[in-house]
């Protein structure tokens, strides 16, 4: 029934990788099953042969989905099936999309969809690298115009050594988690989180990963040759040189002037005016002219004008030199009732960032294929439409917002205290209130400030900077602190976050081939200077964490009890702990080893909760006097509660010095009495005495008198 499948197996570091096609999903344009040491991902690619008429963008969609059966699990929840993509799935989809998107021809507008499904998972092999390899292989054998293949590698830094594709266990001990993807000749994408590594160490890791992934590229080329799918007969549409010349005559000089307007919204208004004038003039000449084609050529002209000016060494769009950072304004404690807040403004980019402290119960529970884990540091990034002066839909976070939030979190993670050092769950929210480039790096700066304002003892201040590149032939200019237009019209988006001593996160997206090690080195060095400048301004506003947390934040008090006593504090069906939390207004968390964490905004409430827990867990001591309450009477004596849940018997002979005929003549239920513990027998029964308790104070006074004299 099946033709013989094509299988390619190769060694990639410590892992064996297998590519297979020809058995599954034969109606797709291309489909590949990639296996890497028991982690298997099925990748399909479907491309439409025809583009939608008049479409002026490339509709590439990447869907990444993890099936729970891959780990031998059934989904939790009511519906028992996978739902919308998780944050992790969204981030992996972006990781796949970023290096492949620049490799399709500029004029190619046919719809392409990549669907990657994780069907088997080895807990020690993360699915993202095999997924990227499988996507590259599927596109390579699809016949779709694609200037690949690409390779992908994860790089760790363990004991001073770079490690290729470290296992999950190794990654836990690594100072670096870096993913790099690229073609045979160029790096296209880097995503990383680091523990204060130097610029030289980061660059070495990028180069190492790119060198190692050549094995993958060679294997995919051999796989492609064996499959031998005919290439599509797609030809790029001819350039309308006549229209291009007309638009240049009408708009070029005006655009040069417009791009000297330094204020973003005023510049945009002028560019829109010029575009409208061009449209009007061309439609007057030819009412049948294609307005979408006019728009595309006009946009290309904008790009040419800006790039030519930068390469010529002229001041940038907003008047800065290539290595200048925009004006900074840093404010902390801007919101009165939040636990920590900061307003970070860099030029026309602004982030209002808040930090909120919660208990460990507030931690995010993340159910992954490899198991459940808790995240005690959350960072959420919001990009509302008003921040760029637009109207738009406001709803659940988009892929871009999730990706930018994750990048900012990576930048801060290395300086966060451990849960043992700071037993709080911390949630940071970055509201982008103005945007003109590098809002994710503004979020890093604002997060660092908001955390310190909240009293979180971070190890060092962190700042972030976005670098850009314009390259024409052998000429290139590296730009510091890029604007939105420079990002859009340039060749590289290179974001670096770090402290004064090292890099904590690096993200790089390159739109062209030919980015050399030299260019990356210049960008990293230029970024270091900019980062240190920003840190110096931040330190003037707030140089370290505040001495105390906000008065509105919960204070966590820790105590330890015997593990055997946990059941007493919880009570039957949770009755005791529920009563404790409701009556004291605290949040109480109990760990299996007997550690109890009590969170309260008021100290008195925490003290009361501690006192009551101590009462519940206290042991009755022989010889000690207690103030107890009569629980019930019997003919032979009275049962007295000396501690919560702990009763003892006062025998009728121990009630008073004289003979007692009837217990009720001396005691009533609910009466408070002083009792001394005489004995606890093998069965745990407590024998009490009232008459011994009466004699004790006189004995104590006699014993303490000499001690007072000695003082």
From Swiss-Prot:
Gene: pnp
GO biological process: mRNA catabolic process; RNA processing
Cofactor annotation: Mg(2+)
CDD domains: KH-I_PNPase (cd02393), RNase_PH_PNPase_1 (cd11363), RNase_PH_PNPase_2 (cd11364), S1_PNPase (cd04472)
GO MF annotations in UniProt: 3'-5'-RNA exonuclease activity; magnesium ion binding; polyribonucleotide nucleotidyltransferase activity; RNA binding
UniProt lineage: Bacteria, Pseudomonadati, Pseudomonadota, Gammaproteobacteria, Vibrionales
Protein name: Polyribonucleotide nucleotidyltransferase
Family to which this protein belongs: Belongs to the polyribonucleotide nucleotidyltransferase family.
Summary of subunit composition and partner proteins: Component of the RNA degradosome, which is a multiprotein complex involved in RNA processing and mRNA degradation.
Domain KH: 554-613
Pfam families: KH_1 (PF00013), PNPase (PF03726), RNase_PH (PF01138), RNase_PH_C (PF03725), S1 (PF00575)
EC number: 2.7.7.8
């Amino acid at each position: 029934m099946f033709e013989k499948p094509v299988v390619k197996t190769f060694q990639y570091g410590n892992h064996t990788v297998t590519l297979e096609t020809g058995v599954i999903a034969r109606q797709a344009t291309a489909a590949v099953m990639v296996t890497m040491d028991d982690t298997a991902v099925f990748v399909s690619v479907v491309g439409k042969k025809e583009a939608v008429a008049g479409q002026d963008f490339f509709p590439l969609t990447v869907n990444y989905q993890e099936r729970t059966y891959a780990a031998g699990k059934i989904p939790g929840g009511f519906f028992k099936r996978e739902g919308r993509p998780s944050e992790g799935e969204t981030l992996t989809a972006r990781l796949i999309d970023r290096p492949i998107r620049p490799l399709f021809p500029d004029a190619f507008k046919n719809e392409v969809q990549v669907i990657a499904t994780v069907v088997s998972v080895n807990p020690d092999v993360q699915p993202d690298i095999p997924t990227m390899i499988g996507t590259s292989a599927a596109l390579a054998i699809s016949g779709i115009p694609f200037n690949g293949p690409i390779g992908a590698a994860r790089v760790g830094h363990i004991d001073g050594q770079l490690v290729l594709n470290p296992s999950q266990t190794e990654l836990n001990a690594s100072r670096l988690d870096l993913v790099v993807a690229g073609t045979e000749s160029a790096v296209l994408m880097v995503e990383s989180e680091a523990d204060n590594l130097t610029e030289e160490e980061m660059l070495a890791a990028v180069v190492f990963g790119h060198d190692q992934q050549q094995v993958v590229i060679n294997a995919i080329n051999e796989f492609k040759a064996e499959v031998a799918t005919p290439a599509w007969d797609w030809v790029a549409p001819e350039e309308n040189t006549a229209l291009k010349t007309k638009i240049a005559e009408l708009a070029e000089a005006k655009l040069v002037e417009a791009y000297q307007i330094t204020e973003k919204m005023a510049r945009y208004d002028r560019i829109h005016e010029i575009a409208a004038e061009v449209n009007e003039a061309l439609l007057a000449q030819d009412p049948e002219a294609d307005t979408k084609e006019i728009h595309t050529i006009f946009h290309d002209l904008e790009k040419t004008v800006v790039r030519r000016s930068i390469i010529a060494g002229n001041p940038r769009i907003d008047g800065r030199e290539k290595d200048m950072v925009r004006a900074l304004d840093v404010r902390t404690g801007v919101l009165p009732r939040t636990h920590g807040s900061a307003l970070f403004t860099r030029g026309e980019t602004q982030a209002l960032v808040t930090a909120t402290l919660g208990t460990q119960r507030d931690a995010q529970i993340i159910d992954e294929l490899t198991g459940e884990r808790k995240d005690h540091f959350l960072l959420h990034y919001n990009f509302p439409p008003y921040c760029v002066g637009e109207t738009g839909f406001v709803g659940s976070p988009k892929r871009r917002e999730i990706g930018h939030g994750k990048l900012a979190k990576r930048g801060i993670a290395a300086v966060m205290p451990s849960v043992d050092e700071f037993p709080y769950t911390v949630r940071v929210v970055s509201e982008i209130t103005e945007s003109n480039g590098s809002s994710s790096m503004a979020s890093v700066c604002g997060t660092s400030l908001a955390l310190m304002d909240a009293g979180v003892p971070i190890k060092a201040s962190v700042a972030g900077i976005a670098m850009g590149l314009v390259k024409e032939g052998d000429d290139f200019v590296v730009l510091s602190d890029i604007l939105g237009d420079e990002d859009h019209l340039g060749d590289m988006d290179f974001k670096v976050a770090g402290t004064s001593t090292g890099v904590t996160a690096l993200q790089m997206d390159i739109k062209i081939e030919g980015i050399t090690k030299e260019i990356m080195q210049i960008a990293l060095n230029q970024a270091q200077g900019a980062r240190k400048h920003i840190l110096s301004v931040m330190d003037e506003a707030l140089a370290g964490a505040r001495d105390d947390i906000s008065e509105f934040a919960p204070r966590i008090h820790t105590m330890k009890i015997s593990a055997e006593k946990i059941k007493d504090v919880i009570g039957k069906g949770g009755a005791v702990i529920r009563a404790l939390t409701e009556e004291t207004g605290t949040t109480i968390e109990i760990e299996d080893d007997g550690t109890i964490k009590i969170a309260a905004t008021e100290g008195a409430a925490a003290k009361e909760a501690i006192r009551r827990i101590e009462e519940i867990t206290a042991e009755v001591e022989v010889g000690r006097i207690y103030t107890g309450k009569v629980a019930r009477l019997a003919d032979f004596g009275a049962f007295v509660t000396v501690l919560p849940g702990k009763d003892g018997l006062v025998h009728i002979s121990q009630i008073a010095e004289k003979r007692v005929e009837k217990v009720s003549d001396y005691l009533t239920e609910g009466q408070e009495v002083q009792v001394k513990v005489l004995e606890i027998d093998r069965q745990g029964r407590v024998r009490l005495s009232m008459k011994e308790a009466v004699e004790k104070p006189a004995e104590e006074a006699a014993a303490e008198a000499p001690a007072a004299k000695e003082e």
